[in-house]
Amino acid sequence: MSDLVRSPARAVMVLGTSSGAGKSWLATALCRWYARQGLKVAPFKAQNMSNNARVVPGLIGADGAQPMGEIGSAQYFQALAARCVPGVMHNPVLLKPEADTRSQVVVLGEVRRDLAEVPWRERSEALWPHARAALQQLMAHNDVVVIEGAGSPAEINLHASDYVNMRTALAAQAACLVITDIDRGGAFAHLYGTHQLLPADERALIRGFVLNRFRGDAALLAPGPEQLQALTGVPTIGVLPMWREHGLPEEDGLYEPGGHTAAPGHAAQRLRIAIVAYPRISNLDEFQPLRNLPGVQLVWARQPADLERADWVILPGSKHSQADLAWLRAQRLDAAIARHAAAGGALLGICGGLQMLGEALIDLHGVEGGFDALGGNGPGLGLLPLVTQFDPHKLLRPTRASFGATHGVWAALAGVAFDGYEIHNGRSIQHPAMASALPALRSTCGDTIGWQNGSVLGVYTHGLFESPAVLQALFGAGCRTLDSVFDGLADFAERHFSLGALAGLLSPKQPPG
């Protein structure tokens, strides 16, 4: 069967010379730019590897039921930028790393445990039909599909089984851009090398090069772009200045050199928030609004000293709560966290972080077993009187939740309602033999999904800091709307691409001459 997707839709694909080159944010900008032209737009990434995920509607089953599924956060935001409803078709395969050599495999929103142990090359061939079918559906029902690649398309040791980059590009006959991070150095060599390592039929799809994170006078680039075009036949159609404050979460987290990031333009920090950066941290994108707040400093805590001057400490989500809890103890962060709580410092656990704050974690089914010889039953930090039991069934749901009568350092949250989402296997209950904790957060279904014990608060719901109501209650400040972020990205791309370049990508490639 031919891989070619036959459709009147046009596809624009963003490739990169490496991970972190800027593919995700540029794809998001293109989604909004094309949507603003009155076109029906959808994002697509055949396979994403990330523990940053969002809950979206899954496929409708034969019984008419529509379960919830999960996709990478980048494609979730790209769908919103495209003004379409995020769904599993936008990211048909999601790999969620659980250990250095193992990932949970999510196909069309559902966990496929049978594929977790399959060797990479064999698994890629099994997954490609799902990705191709999703791409075909999107191209059949949209005017433009904006596709994001992964890593580099020119990894010659992986190329034969790489369906995320050029196999997808060929199937969609996409107009491809290649973006590189010029701030790292070697940009022209990276672009030329990427181009030359691709077979001729794949090189023919490349319509433009993009230099990202450029500092200084663009005139200093000459004659580099002209010489590169003479060598490859591909023009450089965008030179994008360094821009840190675009407001979109980074695909792989918020890490910055020096271990912290401060709100831009505010030298005097009023509130220091330490987020424990364990190895299998997940859903980091939900902290982006904190990064944007004036007067807030985020610290990524990896050692006890990082917590010493913290006003707040946050234990974020985790893809493997017990392994990350063991790491936390090995770093002696457990004692530092306990001291912070004993001193009345605000301590927040979200999802996996909530589980770690409890008295015990019980894994009778081996849900978290088999990774790094960890799993089974183990003690928590003992700061919330809860017991968590892991269940093979993963709970995926969007959640409308309301805080009850929170008190102390969390009193401002009392009565605040917000929309979030849940992605977890564990179920936590308050053990009747233990000290009581105040049920602090309930879903509209009536479930208790948050507890408070003194200055310690644990919630299962992600998305707390993405709520304007929560930010107003806690910080007396609002946040930029996502729409304004997406429009800002589109405006930025429009200013820094060659005149007519973005619209020109939707036109058939003109033969040389």
From Swiss-Prot:
A Pfam entry, by short name: CbiA
Protein's UniProt keywords contain tRNA processing: no
Claim: Secreted is one of the keywords in the record: no
Annotated GATase cobBQ-type domain residues: 270-470
GO MF: ABC-type vitamin B12 transporter activity; catalytic activity
SUPFAM superfamilies: Class I glutamine amidotransferase-like, P-loop containing nucleoside triphosphate hydrolases
Listed pathway(s): Cofactor biosynthesis; adenosylcobalamin biosynthesis
Stored InterPro entries: Class_I_gatase-like, CobQ/CobB/MinD/ParA_Nub-bd_dom, CobQ_GATase1, CobQ_N, CobQ_synth, GATase_3, P-loop_NTPase
Family recorded in the similarity comment: Belongs to the CobB/CobQ family. CobQ subfamily.
Protein name: Cobyric acid synthase
Gene: cobQ
